[in-house]
């Protein structure tokens, strides 16, 4: 039970950080403006993403909300069943849950997701903190599952 409470608190803290950064961006940067943050590495901007990754499937908020809920509920169920498994499995699922819920909050409350990070050194989609949680969480989860498969667990 203690481990579940710790994971829940971590999820809430991660969501809080995501929402805090999004709120700061909305208040400090006009829509569409780009500001250098770490020169030649990362710029900050304010983008209202009404689609999915890379802004695909624009204005399908209900679809994304339903998909997000299904994924988050599935991740919570899987986490519940595998709470005593490896630290990495738990960490990956925790990040996926926090990232999914962070973007879900935006979709439901605003009808779009606030994106802000622009990588200056590569042509890549503008993304947010929750997207980072999701990406890192999926990578960690895949590595943990691959490791379990190799070890025969």
Curated annotation (Swiss-Prot):
The chain crosses the membrane at residues 6-26, 60-80, 85-105, 124-144. One of its GO terms (cellular component) is plasma membrane. The keyword Protease applies. One of its GO terms (molecular function) is endopeptidase activity. It is found in: Cell membrane. The active site is at 115, 131. This is Lipoprotein signal peptidase. The lineage of its organism: Bacteria, Bacillati, Bacillota, Bacilli, Lactobacillales.
